[in-house]
């Protein structure tokens, strides 16, 4: 870390200004009744950039060039084109467009003005790459804030996964983490390109109030950290200062006494525009369709950016989230089969206190552009999450009376800590006829988990002088609540912990994109070296491990035409795994390999995109919960996943934005310590996943600003949470949602109704010890939101 800081300080002292290879700005209307209003759907091009950028609904754009960008041309239907000169790396540009009276048609102006940006042409700077999405030898899908708003989602757990092929959730709790699965494995989570994933559950799901976009990376990503499942990862890009004044407020209300207020403020703090800020805040409270459940949340997220020089910028951000909720998890269980209980059934009791969570995270970033070809980025981040609470649990069927659940309270006190550092350089140079785009850097990460976990505190003495658990019976056929369950707090806090785990890793990597034949063919070799150490102490059993691993990568991408490319990818990864076996054996990392080919196409100047990928993934060193004691782990064997991903997203015709995706996945166990599981489906297996979302803005001659939405989620061939030799029948999943919206230059209103058909839906099913477990999903419910931008 000392070397990273020293390098960053050195960069701050380097000489004259440099031109920009990345230009950011906002496009606004300059005259008329909507003067100053942002213009979404404007195209921004440059002779120095191979791709065209499109402004989002707030008018913002980002354009990346292979050389320094000196000229921009902005076009928008119904407005006079504007060409501007770019000099130096100053604050974000503001470009004004004037309506073209000779060509403007009322309908065309309004329809284009209210364009929703469902697609994007470039990855965020957090992914470290400077190659347009179309030219990358990897399948990356982005979910924009317009999509999230139209679907009424308030955080990562509420349907964001429906917008990317094959992504499903383990829904054991919407408060503990996103738990996203894809291509036969749980995908890693990143925030602004930084690994802040705790050892245990988490991270806490990011709130929509701070999300700028969510990027799903299919397959391993050596350019990020290669520490994660070979299925891929997702990266949450948080809102940053834009340099232009921005003030917005959003109010939502809905079913189950749902209320939410959010504010988004930003702009310059100094006349020069060098010091900028962004402040997001949110407060929410809601009850639930499940008895005795509730959720209260508070979020504050300030960001400061300082343009130290024309070439050097510093950004500091902080996130604070406080949660209080009724149920640790809405899981229910019965011996009578999946979905056999009422939707509002719970095993909890009102006498139990709430679960409380306090989550702190921060990040500091320094970027420095040496010249038009070379840029250095350094970043440090931390996360501290504290959670405490009690809950009731049932571990096995009651043989005396299966319909009576024997509930016993458990107590958890968890603290997860992550510290992450990274530094990387992007550079461009040529060797003869070859053009190189180099990415090289270093990552360091320290994770720690302390817990008094699964504490069985409610016991009674036995005649033999021992203790036994105290049970609170609950008849699933005629539940009667009101038991007084005693609360509990660890008397010495984490000093009385039964779990302490650490993972530390350090990594060096280099990736070189070599362009041939006037950038038609791109070959991307890379390699990453990772050293990882783990230490574990679980209920008195200690273990440790140390591994040094080199993971190579090779990508190929060929541009058949300016809007069509094909690619191939070979990449390997590893996952450091914490935990202890009951015998204290060392746990080795999970290792994975991905082989993939695909084709990508941009349509209508990038207004909508399509991607098709075929993959084959192998994994070894898979970790599972010890069936004899949930505090311990076992390494079980190997599996593979193969399948097809299809993604279509964007504005296919004027006014109609779509998100359509399909995934076929075939994932099986190849070897296991339990021979009966060989050939069985992997955990949370789903054979077919198909999602569709349509949003249509009516032509202005009918009703100005009115739009309608309709979408569904469909899953067929679903497996269970744990691998089993004989699957229990799990019903298919189909949910239909619809909505209506209206917007003007400053006001947006959206009404969304989920589960229109009021289907009885279940998620994350499994069978163990004679009981069927699952998480019920809400019936028909609605949300109304209103957002005003000043």
Model-derived features: positions:
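Short acidic/polar hinge/loop motifs at secondary-structure boundaries
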Residues: 62-64, 168-170, 179, 194-218, ...
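Structural signature of Gram-negative outer-membrane beta-barrels, strongest in the C-terminal barrel
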Residues: 309, 416, 435-437, 443-447, ...
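Membrane-embedded beta-barrel scaffold of Gram-negative outer-membrane proteins
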Residues: 368-381, 385-391, 591-651, 657-670
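Outer-membrane beta-barrel translocator/receptor signature
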Residues: 210-212, 223-302, 308-312, 608
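C-terminal beta-signal and adjacent terminal beta-strands/loops
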Residues: 658, 713-721, 742-790
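Short, acidic, small-residue-rich periplasmic hinge/interaction motif at the N-terminus
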Residues: 28-35, 40-47, 71, 75-79, ...
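Gram-negative outer-membrane beta-barrel transporters
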Residues: 635-723, 785-789
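Acidic/polar loop-and-plug regions of large Gram-negative outer-membrane beta-barrel proteins
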Residues: 284, 288, 301-369, 373-375, ...
């Amino acid at each position: 870390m000392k070397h990273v800081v020293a390098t960053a300080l050195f960069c701050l002292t380097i000489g004259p200004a440099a031109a920009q290879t990345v230009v950011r700005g906002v496009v606004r209307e300059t005259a008329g009744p909507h003067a100053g209003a942002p213009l979404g759907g404007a195209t921004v091009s440059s002779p120095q950039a191979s791709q065209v950028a499109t402004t989002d609904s707030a008018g913002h754009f980002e354009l990346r060039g292979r050389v320094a960008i000196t000229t921009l041309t902005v076009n928008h239907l119904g407005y006079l084109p504007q060409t501007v000169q770019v000099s130096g790396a100053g604050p974000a540009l503001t470009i004004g467009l004037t309506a073209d009276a000779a060509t403007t048609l009322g309908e065309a102006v309004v329809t284009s003005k209210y364009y929703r940006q469902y697609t994007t042409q470039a990855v965020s700077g957090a992914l470290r790459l400077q190659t347009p999405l179309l030219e990358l030898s990897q399948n990356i899908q982005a979910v924009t804030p317009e999509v999230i708003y139209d679907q009424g989602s308030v955080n990562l757990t509420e349907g964001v996964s429906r917008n990317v092929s094959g992504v499903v959730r383990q829904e054991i709790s919407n408060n503990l983490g996103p738990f996203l699965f894809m291509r036969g494995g749980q995908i890693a989570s990143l925030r602004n390109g930084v690994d802040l994933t705790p050892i245990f559950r988490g991270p806490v799901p990011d709130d929509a109030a701070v999300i700028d976009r969510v990027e799903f990376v299919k397959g391993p990503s050596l350019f990020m950290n290669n520490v994660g499942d070979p299925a891929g990862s997702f990266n949450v890009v948080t809102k940053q200062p834009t340099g232009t004044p921005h003030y917005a407020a959003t109010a939502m209300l809905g079913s189950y006494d749902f209320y939410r207020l959010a504010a988004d403020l930003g702009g310059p703090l100094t006349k020069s525009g060098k010091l900028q800020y962004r402040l997001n805040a949110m407060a929410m409270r809601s009850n639930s369709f499940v008895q005795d459940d509730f959720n209260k949340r508070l979020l504050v997220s300030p960001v400061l950016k300082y343009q130290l020089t024309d070439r050097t910028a510093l950004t500091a951000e902080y996130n604070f989230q406080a949660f209080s909720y009724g149920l640790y998890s809405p899981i229910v269980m019965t011996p009578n089969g999946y979905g056999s209980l009422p939707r509002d059934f719970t095993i909890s009791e009102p006498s139990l206190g709430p679960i409380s969570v306090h989550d702190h995270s921060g990040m500091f970033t320094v970027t420095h552009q040496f010249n038009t070809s070379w840029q250095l980025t350094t970043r440090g981040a931390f996360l501290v999450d504290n959670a405490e609470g009690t809950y009731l649990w049932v571990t096995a069927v009651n043989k005396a009376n299966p319909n009576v659940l024997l509930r016993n309270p458990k107590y958890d006190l968890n603290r997860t800590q992550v510290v992450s550092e990274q530094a990387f350089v992007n550079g461009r140079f040529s060797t003869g006829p070859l053009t190189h785009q180099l990415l090289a850097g270093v990552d360091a990460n320290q994770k720690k988990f302390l817990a008094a976990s699964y504490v069985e505190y409610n016991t009674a003495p036995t005649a033999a002088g021992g203790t036994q658990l105290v049970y609170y019976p609950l008849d699933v056929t005629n539940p009667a609540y009101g038991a007084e369950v005693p609360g509990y707090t660890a008397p010495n806090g984490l000093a009385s912990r039964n779990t302490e785990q650490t993972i530390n890793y350090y990594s060096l990597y280099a990736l070189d994109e070599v362009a041939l034949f006037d950038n038609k063919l791109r070959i991307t070799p890379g390699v990453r070296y990772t050293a990882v150490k783990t230490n574990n102490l679980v209920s008195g059993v200690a273990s440790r491990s140390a591994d040094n691993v080199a993971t190579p990568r090779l990508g190929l991408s060929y541009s058949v035409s300016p809007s069509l490319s094909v690619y191939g990818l070979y990449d390997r990864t590893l996952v450091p795994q914490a935990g202890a076996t009951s015998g204290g054996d060392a746990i080795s990392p999970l290792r994975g390999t991905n082989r993939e080919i695909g084709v990508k196409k941009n349509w209508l100047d990038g207004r909508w995109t399509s991607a098709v990928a075929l993959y084959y993934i192998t994994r070894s060193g898979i970790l599972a919960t010890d069936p004899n004691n949930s505090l311990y782990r076992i390494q079980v064997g190997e599996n593979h996943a193969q399948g097809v991903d299809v993604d279509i997203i964007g504005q296919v015709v004027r006014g109609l934005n779509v998100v359509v995706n399909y995934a076929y996945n075939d994932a099986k166990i190849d070897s296991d310590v339990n021979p009966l599981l060989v050939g069985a489906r992997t955990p949370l297996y789903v054979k077919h996943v198909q999602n569709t979302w349509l949003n249509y803005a009516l032509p202005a001659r009918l009703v100005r600003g009115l739009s309608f939405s309709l979408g569904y989620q469909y899953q067929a061939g679903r497996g269970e949470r744990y691998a089993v030799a004989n699957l229990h029948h799990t019903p298919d999943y189909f949910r239909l949602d619809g909505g209506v919206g209206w917007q003007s230059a400053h006001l947006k209103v959206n009404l969304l109704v989920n589960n229109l058909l009021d289907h009885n839906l279940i998620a994350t099913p499994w069978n163990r010890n004679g009981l069927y477990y699952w998480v019920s999903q809400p019936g028909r419910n609605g949300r109304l939101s209103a957002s005003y931008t000043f």
